Amino acid sequence: MTPTRAQLAAFVDHTLLKPEATAADVAALVTEAAELGVYAVCVSPPMVPAAVQAGAGVRVASVAGFPSGKHVSAVKAHEAALAVASGAAEIDMVIDVGAALAGDLDGVRADIAAVRGAVGGAVLKVIVESSALLALADEHTLVRVCRAAEDAGADFVKTSTGFHPSGGASVRAVALMAEAVGGRLGVKASGGIRTAADALAMLDAGATRLGLSGTRAVLDGLG
């Protein structure tokens, strides 16, 4: 059954992570988010105060180690903690994809655990860059990384930053990730979801949250 506009909006993190974003852009994002009825907005750590100050009762998410994941774990943890202290209720962190490809799952777990320990009760989503793992390794690697995220205390696994050259979310990746975590964690599909059909396909594959930058266009596409 096709969700209503309001039902689809409730899955959405309305996202603005472009480096050129200003405080005014973030305020406009929050206003639009309130109008559309989305679940949350997602902004970079320096923009969290602007999102909170914009008010409207909109939940705020932020990121850590974004977009490369090539940060010392302590730096990711501190960045995440600062975002939470500024008012973020959720953190989307990026793993070290190179460590995952090298089979260093202990390192991946430790990296995630460092951020988990720094954010208290905030929701922690772990970005695994699923397209990169599938292109440069295999399905088993993606599954193992998702299970490592679960072991380390993640609340969600997330497909993509949307900035990696390998691409964004895919139905195949979402289905694999949903199977890997078996309903114990949420699955966020993000990156390249531009139409209502894209969004519905991700939900059908097992996504429980959607990261969208063109939210209005997606919702309008429901007809």
From Swiss-Prot:
List the GO terms this entry assigns under cellular component, sorted alphabetically.
Answer: cytoplasm
Q: Which Gene3D superfamilies match?
A: Aldolase class I
Entry's NCBIfam families?
deoC
Cite the EC number. Answer: 4.1.2.4
Tell me what this protein is called.
Answer: Deoxyribose-phosphate aldolase
Which keywords has UniProt assigned to this entry?
Cytoplasm, Lyase, Schiff base
Q: Which family does it belong to?
A: Belongs to the DeoC/FbaB aldolase family. DeoC type 1 subfamily.
Example of a GO biological process term? carbohydrate catabolic process
Q: Which domain of life is it from?
A: Bacteria
Catalyzed reactions: 2-deoxy-D-ribose 5-phosphate = D-glyceraldehyde 3-phosphate + acetaldehyde
Q: Pfam families annotated for this entry?
A: DeoC
Could you name the active-site residues? Answer: D92, K158, K188
Question: Major place of localization?
Answer: cytoplasm
Q: Which SUPFAM superfamilies match?
A: Aldolase
GN (gene name): deoC
Provide the function of this protein: Catalyzes a reversible aldol reaction between acetaldehyde and D-glyceraldehyde 3-phosphate to generate 2-deoxy-D-ribose 5-phosphate.
Annotated metabolic or biological route of this protein: Carbohydrate degradation; 2-deoxy-D-ribose 1-phosphate degradation; D-glyceraldehyde 3-phosphate and acetaldehyde from 2-deoxy-alpha-D-ribose 1-phosphate: step 2/2
Keyword field contains Zinc: no
Protein's cellular compartments: Cytoplasm
